[in-house]
Amino acid sequence: MMGVLATLFVAFTVNQQVVHAEKVTYSVAPIYPENQTDKNLGYYDLGVKPGQKEEVSVVVQNTGKKDLEVDVAPNTAITNQNGVIDYSQSDPKYDKTLKYPFTKLMSPAQRLKVPAESSRTATFTLNAPKATFEGTILGGFYVSQVKQDQVEQALDHKKGTSLTNRYSYILGVKLTQSDQTVKPHLRLNRIKPGLLNGHTAILSNIQNTKANSIGEMQVDAKIRRAGQSKVLYHSKQTDLQMAPNSNFDYGIDLKNQPLKAGRYNIKIKVNSNKGQWLLSKDF
């Protein structure tokens, strides 16, 4: 899945809550340690030994005319509710199968003050698991600018919230102990009613129980009355992803129609770059 990982891990900009257009005046880059497998990847791909301790550094370059502050946070990769691998959450709810969250292997987040037209380096200590592990530990450094200028904030007095221009970068980190791959395994867990984009929906929790990510997922879900062949609701999505040892709720829109009382069955077919699965559950 290196093509997918390369796409995910190359430092990129995320515009969260745009109030007005603004030029990005900083960039980030990795400093590769000796155990980097390939220095042309654009992300950290580190082969580690049990109990290994090392430093991992991130360079922040300020290309602007003003000083700035950035937060650099080592976050664990999860799967968000859009079916995308997400590195931006500092305190997510971890899947029960995740044995080694990346965040817990790294020293805490740092705040850097970077003078105008200068660079600064954030250095973190990585403590690899003392025991051997299979597959991949996935995380990333989430770098976001700290905004001090209140002029750049738009305050919504009715809701009591503020919107601020914030541009963020992600530098991915992949930890492995061997070249042996672990095949992902998908499981269908709870089925429950909920909301999807403000509409009533059925939410089906899909779990990846193994230490390997999945990309290029095509998900085709159908709901029927239990024991019947007529499809009542159908949902299909492409280009979804799942982080190692993670889960998310896949939603099937009910078009704001109530689901009548009774027994139903859901079948979810998943095709991906790591395999195929057919999941089924009565509810």
Predicted regions and their residues:
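C-terminal segment of classical bacterial N-terminal signal peptides
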Residues: 8-18
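Proline/serine/threonine-rich low-complexity linkers at boundaries of modular beta-sandwich domains
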Residues: 21-38, 175-185
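A surface-exposed loop-and-adjacent beta-strand signature within N-terminal beta-sandwich domains
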Residues: 24, 30-36, 41, 75-119
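Beta-sheet-dominated interaction scaffolds and their linkers
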Residues: 30-64, 68, 111, 185-197
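Short, solvent-exposed loop/turn segments enriched in Ser/Thr/Gly
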Residues: 51-57, 120-122, 134-140, 198-202
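Terminal connector regions
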Residues: 66-97, 119-122, 127-179, 257-283
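Intrinsically disordered, low-complexity Pro/Gly/Ser/Thr-rich segments with frequent PxxP/GP/PP motifs
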Residues: 91-132, 224-260
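Membrane-proximal extracellular "stem/stalk" segments
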Residues: 179-283
